[in-house]
Amino acid sequence: LTLFRAQKSAGTLPDTTADVSETAVTAALRFEPVAFEAGHLLEYDIAPGLSARGDGARLGQALAVLLDNAVKYAAPGTPIQLDAARQGSRAVLAVTNRGEDIPADKLPHIFDRFYRADEARTDGSSFGLGLAIAKAIVDAHRGVIRCESGGGVTRFIISLPLAAGKQERGTDHV
């Protein structure tokens, strides 16, 4: 149902501005105890003043999917990192964890519905919809989501166009 709603709303986002920085901080604060309980430290570096046209609660859902996956798949005792920065005319968010790589041949499929890169890594409670939901939400916000995985580091990156009037020159990199 969540995936259906995310896909259906692709052209019907509210004509409001979402505070991406606040959304990222809220997600970090929400997941700090979850990460801690799982033996991880959640670190975050969030630039202030990032905003995008759309729905902050929906963007928070997308971040929750990425943070939840990072907690599930991070190697024991390793930190999880959430970053948000301005890159030119875009707000870029990244969730990074250390652990087993997602194989390169699986990366093109990880945002497909019901796809799981490794059936052995699931506890049976997952249906393979989380990343599809995150992608549908990001797509609805005219953004891009991608994943890089290699060398024991997996990083999910969301890039969103900044709201009108918020596009400043900058070279902050995530």
Region locations from a protein language model:
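Conserved catalytic submotifs in the C-terminal HATPase_c
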Residues: 14-17, 36, 41-51
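Conserved glycine-rich
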Residues: 40, 142-143
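Short helix-loop "hinge" at the ATP-lid/N-box region of the Bergerat-fold HATPase_c
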Residues: 70-71
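Short alpha-helical Gxxx[C/S/T] motif in the catalytic ATP-binding
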Residues: 130, 134
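Conserved micro-motifs of the catalytic ATP-binding
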Residues: 6-13, 51-54
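Short beta-strand/loop element within the Bergerat-fold HATPase_c
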Residues: 77-89
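Short conserved segment of the HATPase_c
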Residues: 102-114
